[in-house]
Regions:
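Bacterial N-terminal signal peptides that target proteins for export
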Residues: 1-8
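C-terminal motif of bacterial Sec signal peptides marking the signal peptidase cleavage site
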Residues: 15-19
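Beta-rich interaction/scaffold domains
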Residues: 20-152
Length: 152
């Protein structure tokens, strides 16, 4: 009886130690990068800085930056992304995978975002990468006055 208890104790000890094996296989390192970005009314190319994870875009004065449609958002193949819901016009219709053109998106997708402030975008692979997108709107107005006496 005593030998049965010893064998049972040894068996349970080995089983308990075996259950403590740690999974130390690391996740692959896949960098989350945005490779192309465009919005409606964009003037020039987007400035994508992969080191600081920032994007700067300039748009003309004819667009509403509070409901600006993203027309191209290309990320590396393994990545998904999310834009903070407070910036999306329709958060439940915003895509989570990159696209080269609006035609690539399913019907009903809405890519409009409020860019009146810098917008954070979280790219996810096996790691998370925080990107910041800034849209600058150039508003240029020229006023001409007839019969002006002195140069302005």
């Amino acid at each position: 009886m005593k030998s049965l208890q010893i064998y049972l104790f040894l068996f349970l000890s080995v089983f308990a130690l075996g259950a403590c094996i740690q999974n130390d296989i690391p996740y692959p390192y896949i960098k989350g990068e945005i490779t192309a970005f465009e919005v409606e009314g964009q003037t020039g190319d987007a400035e994508i800085n992969k080191n600081s994870r920032t994007i700067a875009v300039e748009v003309g004065d004819e667009v509403d930056i509070e409901e600006l449609r993203i027309t191209r958002f290309v990320v590396n193949e393994e990545a998904t992304y999310s834009v903070d819901e407070q910036y999306c016009v329709s958060p439940n219709k915003f895509p989570s995978a990159g696209f080269s053109a609006l035609a690539d998106l399913p019907a009903g997708a809405d890519t409009r975002v409020d860019f009146s402030k810098t917008v954070p975008v979280l790219l996810r692979t096996y790691q998370d990468y925080q990107w910041m997108i800034t849209v600058r709107q150039t508003i240029e107005r020229v006023v001409e006055v007839e019969n002006q006496a002195l140069p302005a």
